């Protein structure tokens, strides 16, 4: 089994004038002026984490992400997602796998790789080819207030809470989701990732539709005992055979609460 590939990943370079970095996601097809920062390509080794599946270190708490296999869904057929049923199924899965008492899905994205196509329709987004974390801690708290009743938010925020993404291929075997293992229009806030040679990147090769990855995007436990979040990115696997169908995936983003 392959131990990894060498690939180009894209990292954020801060604005040269010291401004706070921003991106306008709904600015239309001309993306040249949608952000005030630049991207820096770096050639890195992306390790195949399938060779480490017996390692207890790759869990949500220790690494910030976790692969689950032999978990087929009945709500994706012929490339089409039955969203309502998939939501209900995913909530049940997340409660089972994390021990959470409450799970709230606040959005989803279906990504179908289409060269030359752009747009922010949640069913037509392209794979996100920049290293990033979906939510800062400030944005995580704002999500709780935005998506939960005002009377419920204080009690939920007083206990452990997280944002966790559930990422699953739709049809084709897919592996072009890079994960950084050692991770520390409404406006939102995300983390851009700068390159550091100490980073270690990995992926799960040839993921199937009966597999998914849980990706932690933020965490209320801030004492260093658990992983806070996982930077991630799409990337072009140079070993992909010519003519391979383009990647298709669905990612749901969830607020996860514990008693």
Where are these regions (language model features)?
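Non-heme Fe(II) oxygenase catalytic core, chiefly the N-lobe of the double-stranded beta-helix
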Residues: 3-190, 198-200, 205
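Catalytic core of Fe(II)/2-oxoglutarate
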Residues: 189-259
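Basic/polar N-terminal segments that are highly enriched at the extreme N-terminus
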Residues: 1-6, 257-259
């Amino acid at each position: 089994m392959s131990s990894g590939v060498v690939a180009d990943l894209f990292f954020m370079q801060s604005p040269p004038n010291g401004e706070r970095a921003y991106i306008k996601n709904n600015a239309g097809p001309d993306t040249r002026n949608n952000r005030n920062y630049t991207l820096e390509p770096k050639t890195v080794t992306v390790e195949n984490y399938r060779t480490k599946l017996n390692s207890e270190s790759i869990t949500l708490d220790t690494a910030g992400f976790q692969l689950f296999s032999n978990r087929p869904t009945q709500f994706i057929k012929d490339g089409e997602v039955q969203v309502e049923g998939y939501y209900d199924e995913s909530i049940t899965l997340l409660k089972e796998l994390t021990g959470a008492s409450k799970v709230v899905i606040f959005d989803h994205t279906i990504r179908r790789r289409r060269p030359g196509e752009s747009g922010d329709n949640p069913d037509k987004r392209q794979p996100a080819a920049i290293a990033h974390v979906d939510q800062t801690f400030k944005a995580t708290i704002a999500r709780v207030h935005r998506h939960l009743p005002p009377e419920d938010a204080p009690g939920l925020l007083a206990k452990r809470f997280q944002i966790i993404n559930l990422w699953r291929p739709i049809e084709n075997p897919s592996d072009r989701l890079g994960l950084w293992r050692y991770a520390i229009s409404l406006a939102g806030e995300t983390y851009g990732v700068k390159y550091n040679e100490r980073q270690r990147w990995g992926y799960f090769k040839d993921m199937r539709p009966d597999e998914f990855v849980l990706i932690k995007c933020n965490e209320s436990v801030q004492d260093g005992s658990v992983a806070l979040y996982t930077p991630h990115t799409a990337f072009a696997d140079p070993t992909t055979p010519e003519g391979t169908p383009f990647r298709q995936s669905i990612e749901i983003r969830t607020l996860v609460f514990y008693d």
